[in-house]
């Protein structure tokens, strides 16, 4: 069987075949054999073989010169004159198709990533490798594993399938199908995927995340679940290196702290490092209460930390505690076409500021509030909350309260420099005005028939309410006024100066605050 033998050969031998030639370049020894009418070249020791631009190496290689194929053993190495190198303990190579079967301790490197498996089928001509019995790709500190995978050498993409995991120092990704590029480090999600980073869990079905730049784009209603918040939107763009995010299309932000608020919009931009939220395109802030929810909408809603405010808000409460709870270190601002709706209170204004530390909502520029049938206006209105329910209203400058009397065109009215309204269990309990106080009150008899109009002035006027209806009026200091029969007064004297009944601007439901009415 042994035709010839040579040691430390460096002679080139060319196989006789109609296909692309396999060239024997060097080996420590070789044998030529003929078995069943097939010719074999047995090469041993630092074997080097060439086919076109493809080089093959091994401890020993048997070349079937008849079929233009070979079998390699020990430290097998294939390189196609590029940066992709494959290694294995065992190789079967078809020189006609340039397809290789690598087995045992298989390794593929492309200069950036290293793929290891126990079985790899590799097409040298198109640089595609396939494994089906488990594989691992390592790129720096990033490790990817799956049961099946396909490596594309031209694009440097790897398609992982079946029990896929990607682990790096910052993220752990679990999915069924994942595409990863060893050069750009871009991971593409094409099946339901979970991305875990500390306490944060991202769920997506479609999108991508760059392990190197920490930037990602997620689609098809992806979500982010963290210890303090939950985000969901049709589309997301995130930058973990800067802590930034943009959420588009039916975006919802839900807080998980004791404040329990939700923010909805078609566009929300977030800065996690500075705790900033900017919502546009029909934004709605929902402040949850035990039995009621307050809805606030505007052209723009903004949230940030109180400690980052450059301007200081004037104190409203007589005693304000130091900011100890970090969850209270937050404020909301609303700009332009502000609307408020809850079961007990409704309102509109041009701008709003809500500081969580003092639980006060400040309404500016033509604010109007409605408490059942009572309309309240002033230059500025402060709404003091207790457990997120209205506890008190402070109406500053040009304060006026108006309520319709039944379904008539008559209105009870109260006017002064300022008005304070106290609530008990969400209902009006008392209203008091100070400074140039003036009121018009339509008195009725026991049968609810009008008996006259009381037009009075005093330094202080206090009105007590029961079930939102006035039951008692007290005038303090410098009282002047009189009761006049209704039919004796012209209509012009039935209304105080600057009277404006603005019921058409009142939001009637949580859906109504999204309508353009009142703009």
Predicted regions and their residues:
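N-terminal amphipathic/hydrophobic interface segments
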Residues: 7-519
